[in-house]
Amino acid sequence: MTTLRVLLAVCCAAYCILAEDVTVPANGELKLMPDQKAGGRLEGQWKISTPDHYYLIVSCGLWSSASGTCKDKILITQGGKTTEVCGEGKNSFYVQQDTNLNTAEIIILTNTPDARAMCTVYSAEKPKEENTF
């Protein structure tokens, strides 16, 4: 049983990506660049937040020569909904904003050596609620 636990821990360490917690300052921006791994693969995972009374605008771009598959992808999770952005042999861009959400998680995983990916996350002040009398 102990050998199995050690083997499982080694496998998890080899294949799991640990998310980096980052905070976007109020009215600020943050560029997210994945780490380059062996064979040119890119990997990155971030848990992002901004202060209360602010929301996140997520903007990601991915280019990959791998067409017809989703070998290279960006996963963007906000408010319990995950969006998958695939390279598929072209430039793929994605912008998401929800004025109710001040957290997000982004995962970038590529298997094609020439793939390029990055995200920029902006913090914006939530709109003021108008009093309706």
Curated annotation (Swiss-Prot):
Protein's cellular compartments: Secreted
GO biological process: innate immune response
Signal peptide annotation: 1-22
Tissues in which the UniProt entry reports expression: Expressed by the venom gland.
Further details from the record: Predicted to be an amphipathic alpha-helix.
Function per UniProt: May function as an antimicrobial peptide and may be related to the innate defense of the insect in the salivary glands.
Protein name: Triatox
Organism: Triatoma infestans (Assassin bug)
